[in-house]
Amino acid sequence: MDGVVRDILGRQLEAWLTRVVVRGRPSVVALAFGQGALLAAVDSAEAVLGVLAQHADRLRGRQLTVLVLADGNEELPARLGALEATLPAGVAVHLVPGGPARLPVAVKAAGAAGTPLLSYLDGTGATDPAVLAAGAAGRPGELLLVTDTNLPGVTDTDLPSVADTDRPGAASAPVVPASAMPASTGPVPAPPASAVPASAAPGSAPPVPGPPTSDAPASTAPGSVLPGPPARVSGSVQASLVRAGFPLATQVDLVPIDGSSARRLALGTGHDRSLEAFKDILWTVDEDAGIRYRDPTDPAQHLLHIAADPEPGPLCRELLAELARTGPRTVTELRRHALTATPYRSIDVRRALTEMLTSGAATRDPEHGRLGGDVVITVARRP
């Protein structure tokens, strides 16, 4: 399990560096380990510094501060010191006593407010609101966290899509859970007609204004306010990230096949590209890693096998449930729903929609032509 999480962290860091380094702004990477994660602290911090060493050529002439917050681990100074010696002069590594609770003070001392900030949180205190808010203080801010699924406040029964809360006048309708749909891998049936819809180098750089790009932060429509999560999902890690200031968030449970405790992995970001990269990383994890994925919002707790082309049946059921709950949606809206509210990628939606349309479980408008983003998908009603 720890090896899988380290691999995901390292690859997410690589994706983050690709976006941040080219901008030439001072940046901060903060790693915070609480009680229960101290054994993983050394290996995770080493993995991060190893990634930075691999990108040493791109980091030369750049200013990057790495904060490692952990208590009670005597191996850290020696093992990280050896790796720090291989990094470019502009990369500084600082060990800070304490766990996630010290993150707000540490990132402030490092001048991370208003500069690119990537945070990784593991262990006790990782979901504290003040800690998550500190991770959102970067411009941009991105946060990856892992926590036990049995901690108070991380049990979910349903979670609305971000797109749904963005729609003006969207009705608050009961959710039709994915588990209510047939579990068969055959043709997807339509739902019934009755379905209800610390010490670090100071210094920072001000945010750099510029025209919007495809990597621009997600936002609501002009003049609108980013909605907070509804009360019924107030215990969700994903909802906590949204409340902390991350416009985009997603979560997935990592379930070991050996029966050991599952862990919840969540990402908060402001960039579509980062969220897409995270999902791509998830589905390219080694299929023999000994874990399965689970949607925290699925009451039936179905397990998803890792594959380059995941089986579309569970996503079909989830999309049908979303359509039954909210009414007709465009392909673009369904792609966003899959990206934020399920473990799936947005590219998986086309395959699922094709199966839904072919089986007669859903209809499209217009009826013919390319399945573009503006095509409207509707649940097919039985006579």
Where are these regions (language model features)?
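Conserved proline-anchored active-site loop of SAM-dependent methyltransferases
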Residues: S27-V42, A112-A130, V146-D148, G268
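Short, conserved loop/helix-junction motifs that constitute active-site signature segments
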Residues: R58-L59, A134-P140
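Core SAM-dependent methyltransferase catalytic element
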Residues: R264-A277, T284
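C-terminal target-recognition/interaction regions appended to catalytic cores
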Residues: I281-P383
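Long, intrinsically disordered low-complexity tandem-repeat segments
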Residues: T155-T220, S224
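SAM cofactor-binding core of SAM-dependent methyltransferases
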Residues: D2-A109, R345-E355
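Conserved beta-strand signature within the Rossmann-like core of class I S-adenosyl-L-methionine
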Residues: R139-G153
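A conserved mid-domain beta-alpha-beta active-site/ligand-binding segment of alpha/beta enzyme cores
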Residues: D156, A218-T269, P310
